[in-house]
Amino acid sequence: MNNNSSILFGLFDEFLWIRCSGRGSFANSPTVKSLGDDYIASGGRLIVIDLETCSGIDSTFIGTLAGLSRRLLPIGGSVQIASPSERCLSALESLGLDALLSIEPPTAPWRGKVEQIRAALGTENAPSVHLDAKEQTLHVLNSHLTLSEMSEENEEKFRNVTDCLKEELERQKDQ
């Protein structure tokens, strides 16, 4: 992760809270994915992504959230978004994530406790997940494939990206 972003997290009775400060991007989305994967594997069903201090989110970060949500929905779980800025909300909505994620749900178990939750997170960053070049390319590809599967519009929007990433994986295979 670069110095301009941080991922804080905490496990609470009913949910995993992940707070992204700075930019949510391809650089820190593997950390978010790892936290979510571990939580789901342990039986967790509700992941809350706190975007209050997030200055923006890229398509890889959004695709990572979509991937976690698509894993949780069939087992009765969900990904919820807390305090998104207008910029982050617009980015989520532009790719159709408002249909997949619960954005500021009024009856969420964390409602009325947000400040206490944030205070309980402390200041230590989540351990960064470092991927090698091939793993990073695969992560970015999978995030964009997830977004592409959501709508024809997304598929068209990301076709060049996914094609280039597939070609890059082929080149990396030969090295």
Locations of regions flagged by a protein language model:
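Residues immediately C-terminal
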Residues: 56
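Histidine-anchored nucleotide/phosphate-binding helix
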Residues: 65-69
